[in-house]
Amino acid sequence: MKKLLAVFLAFFLAGLAVPANAGEFGDTLRPKLSAARESLVTMMLHKDQRGSDQQKLVKDTADAVSAQLAKMKAPAGKEAQFKELVETWAAFKKTRETELVPLILKGKDEEAKKLGGGIQKERITKCQNLINELD
């Protein structure tokens, strides 16, 4: 009976030893990533939503992703995936701020759609996939 209790206790305690960030990426980062994407897509598709309020929302939502990433740590054994997520997001954000948003604001919609549907789509998809791997 003591042996059975010891085995049960070991399994129970092992369950408590799950890293504190299990699910953290999907629960906290994914919604911020989605909000950042949605704010930019709204600006791109709706010419009447390119004013200062929407521009601020586009910047704030991207900054929220960066801030959340800065608070997070790689789960044990997944340091490479976390590093790749941070680097991919940084490239995505830089292109967004220095190329994509300026194209949208200049009314160069076709160029913006090409950039948004090309490398930026690849990067955001990679970020989403890495979040899945990190959870």
Model-derived features: where do they sit?
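Membrane-proximal N-terminal soluble sensing/regulatory segments of transmembrane proteins
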Residues: 23-84, 103-119
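Sec/Tat signal peptide C-region and signal peptidase I cleavage site
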Residues: 13-22
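Extended, amphipathic, non-transmembrane alpha-helical segments
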Residues: 91-98
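Extracytoplasmic
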Residues: 115-135
